[in-house]
Amino acid sequence: MTPFSSGVLFLSHHLPFYISKLFIMSNPVSESSSCSKKRVYLETLGCSKNRVDSEIMLASLQNHGYELTMTPDSAEVIIVNTCAFLTEASDKSINMILDLSDFKSSDNCEKIVATGCLTQRYQDSLAEQIPELDGLLGSNGFEQILELVRSMYEGSGHLQAFLKQKPHLQAI
């Protein structure tokens, strides 16, 4: 069995480290949900953990009927997996969200989601300062991307947030 036949993901290594586009080599599963066949674009910023988290999110979405796209202009859902390790990374993440939110004025883009460290750390201020955001997903809950995207389409139109707190040392 090759990695590709098992649906394993691979990265485009010729892109800059801090911005990688991810590809999945598997066929999507059809679903009757209102979200099936939506096109998804994901931009990853930051560390290797974010790359892995992005791969897991994309695999989950694709396995539930979402179509992945290489360009944001053809996506109905745009996801930005952010970084907040340094001030420069936070600024880059915010600028990327703002740049990609411009696609909401196009005919295709319906939803913008921010995930990762920036949303985990600055969830309240992000929700207030970037009203274009439809969803927030913290760095501790990336496996909930499918539930978040579905809730954005089935919800009230308000910002959807799925943010888990890190466990406190005393709770472990």
Model-derived features: positions:
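Proteins enriched for Cys/Gly/acidic motifs involved in redox and nucleic-acid/cofactor modification
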Residues: 22-172
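Short, Lys/Arg-enriched N-terminal segments with co-localized hydrophobic residues
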Residues: 5-24
